[in-house]
Amino acid sequence: MIRIFKKLLNQNFSLKTNMFSRSKFFFIWEICYLRFLYFFLVKKSFKFFEKIEKNTIGVEYSKKSFYDGRIPIYRPDERILLPFFNLLSDPNLEKEKILILGPRYENEIFIARAIGFKKIYALDTFSYSPLVETGDMHNLEYPEDFFDAIVCGWTLSYSTDPQKACNEMSRVLKKNGSVVVAVEKVSLKEREKEESKKITGILTGSSRIQTKDQFDKLFEGLECVSVFDDKKGKVSSPFIITYKKN
């Protein structure tokens, strides 16, 4: 039993690439939950990027989730899965190197491995995970034309300069590579007011990035290949968009 547990915690632990059923994706969540308990609660592992620019907001708000006494509930979540399903809509997608921005609990890392990516880079402003580098999405320390795919899930809203962040994503993306961005589309003003109270400086109103026209300007020169706009939510709903660098 101890041997199995140690294997699950191993940084090089990999999943077979044919795991696409809901039950097998749930297995990923279980692994990440065990790793969180081990690295954060047992080993007290936590690192923080000190050189964050003023463009990034909500760091203290997000970091608080690790220290407010709540242990995260792990279950398959469409917020995590949908960006990858949009990415996989490209039948010619190369699966050599992928960059994941904002993988708080490692789920995206293991999903990327499960769907076949060979080299996975993960970046966040803070993390307990040895699989995640700390850094700033406005200043990516990677060479140009480096990644076959980029997943930016639910992090762009924490930027006061989304153009700079998107420019960096475009710069490090390879030709024929794809970048997927997921944001929360807010349709109720009261929800925006609540967010602005919790997160100082978050963009609201027409400045909030949540439409195709806005993203087309941010990723000028790239081709929009997929849009998922779930308009069912009365308060907010997922908006996921994919661009390809031709």
Outline where the language-model segments fall.
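Class I SAM-dependent methyltransferase SAM/SAH-binding core
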Residues: K97-N139
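Core SAM-dependent methyltransferase catalytic element
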Residues: E220-N246
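A short acidic, Gly/Pro-enriched loop at the edge of an enzyme's catalytic core
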Residues: H138-I150
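Conserved class I S-adenosyl-L-methionine
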Residues: V180-D216
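Short conserved AdoMet
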Residues: L93, T160, K174, E220
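A short glycine-rich, Lys/Arg-flanked "PGG" loop and its adjoining helix->strand segment in the class I
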Residues: Q163-S178
